[in-house]
From Swiss-Prot:
CDD domains: Mb-like. Belongs to the globin family. The keyword Secreted does not apply. This is Extracellular globin-E7. It holds the Pfam family Globin. Residues 1-152 form the Globin domain.
Length: 152
């Protein structure tokens, strides 16, 4: 189980990543997903068509879907340590599995993807003095955070 500080650290890093921009974060997440699991592209055919053909009617749908994905990750991350949100998390899981659009293996892949993006974000921010200083103010030495990250 994660300690309270570890949970808060994950939430703080996610908040910093989101501040950079949702579209950047979404592109990172889906880019990594498709690089690691090209077989999942079939689930997103219409959205990928929108990206490559810039079909005007599909682009808003893609953007809306990507925002829903980020919102789902928000729910999971900010539910850490909050018993009151357990029901919402359960409903989110039931929604996906009930529609047969996500199986348990894919769900685990999604969480691993989220962890990888958070880790990459932390590495990126360590290289930017302003962010690194801010992280150190919150967590102490940033290098120790990365080495001892609860999500490694």
């Amino acid at each position: 189980a994660l300690t309270a500080l570890e949970k808060q650290s994950i939430q703080d890093i996610w908040t910093i990543l989101k501040a950079v921009g949702l579209e950047f974060l979404q592109v990172k997440m889906f880019g990594k997903l498709f690089a690691d699991h090209p077989e999942y592209k079939a689930h997103f055919d219409n959205f990928l068509t929108a990206i490559f053909s810039v079909a005007e009617d599909l682009v808003p749908k893609l953007r809306a879907h990507l925002h829903r994905v980020i919102d789902a990750f928000d729910l999971v991350i900010f539910a850490l340590g909050r018993e009151s949100l357990r029901g919402s998390l359960k409903d989110l899981g039931i929604f996906h599995t009930g529609r047969d659009i996500v199986d348990p293996v894919e769900s685990l892949t999604g969480f691993k993807l989220m962890v990888a993006v958070i880790e990459e974000g932390l590495d990126t921010f360590r290289a930017v003095p302003e962010y690194s200083k801010g992280l150190e103010g919150r967590f102490g030495n940033v290098d120790n955070i990365n080495e001892n990250a609860p999500f490694r």
